[in-house]
Amino acid sequence: MKKKYDIKTTDVETLKKWYHLMTLGRALDEKAPSYLLQSLGWSYHAPYAGHDGIQLAIGQVFTLGEDFLFPYYRDMLTVLSAGMTPEEIILNGISKATDPGSGGRHMSNHFAKPEWHIENISSATGTH
C-alpha cells in the first residue's frame, strides 16, 4: 500500500531556535506592563498571548529583501521572529531616539524597521 502522506520532521536545532524565540518573546511580553506601571514607557501594551504559534511562523517565513511585513500592535513575536532584536523592541516601547522604526516618535507596539521592509501601520487595523 502506498503512503498517502510523507511527514517530515523538524531538526533539533530549529526546535531549539523556535523555543528560544518563544520564551524570549514571552519574557518581553510579560515585562512590558512593568515599564507602563512605572511610567518608564510603553504608552500601552496589548499582550499577544495565545497568538504565539502563528506569530512565530509568520516571522520565520518572512524573507528579508523580498517580503514586506506590516505588523500590528500585538505582533511582537512576529517581528522578533523576523529578526528584530529585543533591544529594538524595547527602544520602541520606551520611545527612545534610537528606535529603528521612528526615532522614538511612534506609539509603543508600533514595530517598524523600514530598511527591512517592516513597516508601521495605524492603530486602526480594521481586523476586529
Indicate residue ranges for each PLM-predicted region.
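Conserved N-terminal diphosphate/IPP-binding helix and adjacent helical/loop segment
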Residues: 5, 9, 25-33
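Cofactor-binding active-site loop characterized by glycine-rich and histidine/acidic residues
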Residues: 30-128
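Charged, compositionally biased N-terminal leader segments and the immediate start
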Residues: 1-15
